[in-house]
UniProtKB/Swiss-Prot annotation:
GO CC terms, sorted: cytosol
Positions bound to FAD: G13, G14, G15, H16, A17, G18
Major subcellular site: cytoplasm
Origin species: Paraburkholderia xenovorans (strain LB400)
Oligomeric form and interacting partners: Homodimer. Heterotetramer of two MnmE and two MnmG subunits.
Family, as annotated: Belongs to the MnmG family.
Record has Transcription as a keyword: no
Keyword entries, A-Z: Cytoplasm, FAD, Flavoprotein, NAD, tRNA processing
Name listed for the protein in its UniProt record: tRNA uridine 5-carboxymethylaminomethyl modification enzyme MnmG
InterPro entries reported for this sequence: FAD/NAD-bd_sf, GIDA_C_N, MnmG, MnmG-rel, MnmG-rel_CS, MnmG_C, MnmG_C_subdom, MnmG_C_subdom_sf
Signal sequence range: none
SMART domains in the record: GIDA_assoc_3
Purpose: NAD-binding protein involved in the addition of a carboxymethylaminomethyl (cmnm) group at the wobble position (U34) of certain tRNAs, forming tRNA-cmnm(5)s(2)U34.
Keyword Secreted carried by entry: no
Length: 652
């Protein structure tokens, strides 16, 4: 067979966004090419060796529900698993895992190399092939031209990346990897609105030089050990290990303050804005000057290395200051640094220049995903990559894009925030960003999305069969609890008191009993009158059984709140589903303020719902738009890409 040079979809970049994009497109049956500057770094965890967390774990579960690889790879590479917020409500509980970098990367590469319809090729991309307003391919650094009907760009921090350690800096995409300078210049020629952001990473420490006897041990959850994927099993996990905790102190803070005159952040060398929710240690000391100590987590990088990641001291201070501040902390007095911490500054492109499908508004068939859109984090990148891969696949198949709603998925919240509000700093997902978070829980991500994924072609038979059995078991057992009744004659006073604290005085369904505070599904099943289904009829293993029980319990206990939220979603549906004509002339909408006309023309929202979330667009402006649409006015063609396409980011 001749070497193929024409594909349906080309994905540029092999990080968390690029790998999910390539796998999703290929699962849909599209011939897909993944171009990476180095095949050895596919799926590499460039910063912290962990996956998940508050809000982030929700995204990972959604990627998994849609057939993605991140959760499954974490189950195969995870060396510590915890449920965060386990004592709080189900909406904010989140899974977090420490991962062995090597095992995680191996799991991702195995999936890439064994995915039908997917080709891998090691070459950096220097140019995009554009004909008119449509992308038609990519050109590599040695001039190889690949044609594609859609291109997904997932360049991470590589676009014109610059690495800073103290006042020294050099060009790079991350430590040890080259920056994508030519590609960045090419994108600027396309008049896409861009800006500059910054992120950083801490120094790495040799575990042989850490005094663990002085540190607080932080083990993972053991009863039960969590799994990340809905198809995951505890048996997949490698050996589990603890993390360790130390703290900064007054001396540490003095050392950091003494080095600020050589900090690229505080001397104006770095212009990019850093992440608010993952600040550098120098930023923490400056912003929280009254705080006497900060908690630092020492996280193992893997089972076959002595390297530790000190989570909480991301820094770009000079190396001598880094060494001194590390050794000022308890247990690290003799620590040897294996790699210095650094900051990296890179180009991003204003996500308000994207459609909700993640396709650029100015170049048809060109999709962006990951840090190029101004986000931070592996999980945010993977979720965007999955969506961009799906929509690139739908684009080449001539089908309508899938744009998840805010009430449907955290992925919908993420993308809607990006394309309507833009970013002024690296965007991180939190549960607080989702107004419908009680409906968007980790535990029901498959119930929300797997059926959609099946229709899109990204969910295989194995996942679909497992999901169908789980869904049917939850439905069947929930119905049984609602239709099985007990009364003072069938439920003895002793049993009722043991379960509820007092006897019952009239008839209740088992669901009514389960709805009471402190009552569990297992507690109801223990009643002689409960006659619960045998576990083996619900699920074939303990992990799936636990998932089913959790679904049943949450669904019944929170039914009233969930129904109330569903009513709110239904009321807002009219705005979310009302599309704005692509050529709508906002100058013809009577009564709109100058600011509203300017912003609507500039950002070209796709729906009334999107328009309502643009800064400065009032409820009155939305009412005027609705009236205008009902009249069927204002369809004069406009050029949606003309506004906001200068080289500087558009102000909000």
């Amino acid at each position: 067979m001749l070497f193929p040079t024409e594909f349906d979809v080309i994905v540029v970049g092999g990080g968390h966004a690029g790998t999910e994009a390539a796998l999703a497109s290929a699962r849909m049956g599209n011939t897909t090419l993944l171009l990476t500057h180095n095949i050895e770094t596919l799926g590499q965890m460039s910063c912290n060796p962990s996956i998940g967390g508050i809000g982030k774990g929700h995204l990972v579960k959604e990627v998994d529900a849609l057939g993605g690889a991140m959760a499954a790879a974490t189950d195969e590479g995870g060396i510590q698993f915890r449920i965060l917020n386990s004592s709080k409500g189900p909406a904010v509980r989140a899974t977090r895992a420490q991962a062995d970098r090597l095992l995680y990367k191996q799991a991702i590469r195995h999936r890439l190399e064994n995915q039908p319809n997917l080709w891998l090729f090691q070459q950096a991309v220097d140019d995009l092939m554009v004909e008119g307003d449509r992308v038609v391919g990519a050109v590599t650094q040695v001039g190889i031209r690949f044609r594609g009907r859609a291109v997904v760009l997932t360049a991470g921090t590589f676009l014109d990346g610059k690495i800073h350690v103290g006042l020294n800096n050099y060009t790079g995409g991350r430590a040890g990897d080259p920056a994508a300078v030519s590609l960045s210049a090419r994108l600027k020629e396309l008049k896409l609105p861009q800006g500059r952001l910054k992120t950083g990473t801490p120094p790495r420490i040799d575990g042989r030089t850490i005094d663990f006897s002085q540190l607080e041990e932080q083990p993972g959850d053991l009863d039960p050990v969590p799994v990340f994927s809905f198809l995951g099993r505890v048996e997949q996990h490698p050996r589990q290990v603890p993390c360790w905790v130390t703290h900064t102190n007054a001396r540490t803070h003095d050392i950091i303050r003494g080095g600020l005159d050589r900090s690229p952040m505080y001397t104006g060398v770095i212009e990019g804005v850093g992440p608010r929710y993952c600040p550098s240690i120098e930023d923490k000391i400056h912003r929280f000057a009254s705080k006497e100590s900060h908690q630092i987590f020492l996280e193992p990088e893997g089972l076959t290395t002595n390297e530790f990641y000190p989570n909480g001291i991301s820094t770009s201070l000079p190396f001598d200051v880094q060494l001194e501040l590390v050794r000022s902390m308890r247990g690290l007095e003799h620590a040897h640094i294996l790699r210095p911490g650094y900051a990296i500054e890179y180009d991003y492109f204003d996500p308000r220049g994207l459609k909700a499908s993640l396709e650029t508004k100015v170049i048809s068939g060109l999709f962006f995903a990951g840090q190029i859109n101004g986000t931070t984090g592996y999980e945010e990148a993977a979720a965007q990559g999955l969506l961009a891969g799906i929509n690139a696949g739908l684009y080449v198949q001539g089908k309508e894009a899938w744009c998840p709603r805010r009430d449907q998925a955290y992925l919908g919240v993420l993308v809607d925030d990006l394309v309507t509000r833009g970013v002024s700093e690296p965007y991180r997902m939190f549960t607080s960003r989702a107004e419908y978070r009680l409906s968007l829980r980790e535990d029901n991500a498959d119930m929300r999305l797997t059926e959609i994924g099946r229709e899109l072609g990204v969910v295989d038979d194995v996942r679909w069969d497992a999901f169908s059995r789980k869904r049917d078991a939850v439905s069947r057992e929930t119905e049984r609890l609602r239709t099985t009744w007990v009364n003072p004659k069938t439920l003895s006073a002793d049993e009722a008191t043991a379960l509820l604290g007092k006897p019952i005085d009239h008839e209740y369904s088992l669901a009514d009993l389960l709805r009471r505070p402190g009552v569990s599904y297992d507690g109801v099943c223990a009643l002689r009158a409960g006659a619960c289904a045998a576990p083996e009829t619900l699920a074939e293993d303990d992990v799936l059984l636990a998932q089913i029980k959790e679904q049943i319990e949450i669904g019944i206990k929170y039914q009233g709140y969930i129904d109330r939220q569903a009513g709110e979603i239904e009321r807002n549906e009219a705005h979310e589903s009302t599309r704005l004509p692509e050529g709508l002339d906002y100058a013809e909408v009577r009564g709109l303020s100058f600011e509203a006309r300017q912003k609507l023309t500039q950002f070209r929202p796709e729906t009334i719902g999107q328009a309502s979330r643009i800064s400065g667009i009032t409820p009155a402006a939305i009412s005027l738009l609705m009236v205008h649409l009902k009249r069927g006015l204002g369809r004069r063609p406009t050029k949606p890409a003309e506004s906001g396409t200068d080289s500087a980011p558009v102000t909000q």
